[in-house]
Amino acid sequence: MGASLNEIKTKIASTKKTSQITGAMQMVSAAKLQKAESHAKAFQIYAEKVRKITTDLVSSDKEPAKNPMMIKREVKKTGYLVITSDRGLVGGYNSNILKSVMNTIRKRHANESEYTILALGGTGADFFKARNVKVSYVLRGLSDQPTFEEVRAIVTEAVTEYQAEEFDELYVCYNHHVNSLVSDARMEKMLPISFEESGQQKPSLETFELEPDRETILNQLLPQYAESMIYGSIVDAKTAEHAAGMTAMRTATDNAHSVINDLTIQYNRARQASITQEITEIVAGASAL
């Protein structure tokens, strides 16, 4: 019984240390989440302004814009930019989006020639590699608050491949941050660019004279616009990642406390049984005398 008591005490001590670690990780993730949410809100304001200006420019002429970035073409190949984390300990953050992507690929495509994948995040890259799914581009090791410079390579690669007609449409697959408890797996079509959901207000640029002409401006602006929208998805996904990490560590801490309580009850019962047995043996010995 003594050895059993010692084993339980060791488990309790070990679990307490684990709960301290997960509790600290929860606090770190909470701090990262707060910064990420501020970053995401600031970018959203910028993105809305850019979208309005771009929409006004596209709509500033009676003739529809003829830029290749906006023209729908026959879809022979689809590009998927899949955003995951580099590390684990984020609950179902990675599995949700990866499962969604794989289900979509199975439904839409007959073979590998019909799609290509760009992976942002080590978890996604390793996931596809383990399943012999070809990945055309991989970017790992993003910081907790990624700047555009960090992701410029993969974002530019996605836009460049589309412009070169290596694929005919691009979907960005990521977890959208709703709140600290909820994220939503999304698969957003980024290319070709569409402004169909824009409001019906009269464009504010139609009274302006554009220099150089509208098409020349759009040739420069639309690729940058697409890159900024993709970057916005990355910022959003990173925020969801921090929220998932915080939730996972909070759950782990709560589970550790529950285990400690159960072990403490088990320890007290075992100790009580040990004491009862000792008393019984003493009484039996005294009676024998």
From Swiss-Prot:
Main location: membrane
Topology within the bilayer: Peripheral membrane protein
One GO BP annotation of this record: proton motive force-driven plasma membrane ATP synthesis
Key word Membrane present: yes
Gene3D superfamilies: 3.40.1380.10, ATP synthase, gamma subunit, helix hairpin domain
GO MF terms held by the record: ATP binding; proton-transporting ATP synthase activity, rotational mechanism
Keywords per UniProt: ATP synthesis, Cell membrane, CF(1), Hydrogen ion transport, Ion transport, Membrane, Transport
One Pfam family from the record: ATP-synt
Cross-referenced SUPFAM superfamilies: ATP synthase (F1-ATPase), gamma subunit
Subcellular location: Cell membrane
Entry GO terms, CC: plasma membrane; proton-transporting ATP synthase complex
Function in brief: Produces ATP from ADP in the presence of a proton gradient across the membrane. The gamma chain is believed to be important in regulating ATPase activity and the flow of protons through the CF(0) complex.
Family indicated by similarity: Belongs to the ATPase gamma chain family.
Self-association and partners: F-type ATPases have 2 components, CF(1) - the catalytic core - and CF(0) - the membrane proton channel. CF(1) has five subunits: alpha(3), beta(3), gamma(1), delta(1), epsilon(1). CF(0) has three main subunits: a, b and c.
PANTHER family according to UniProt: ATP SYNTHASE GAMMA CHAIN, ATP SYNTHASE SUBUNIT GAMMA, MITOCHONDRIAL
UniProt protein name: ATP synthase gamma chain
Gene source species: Lactococcus lactis subsp. lactis (strain IL1403)
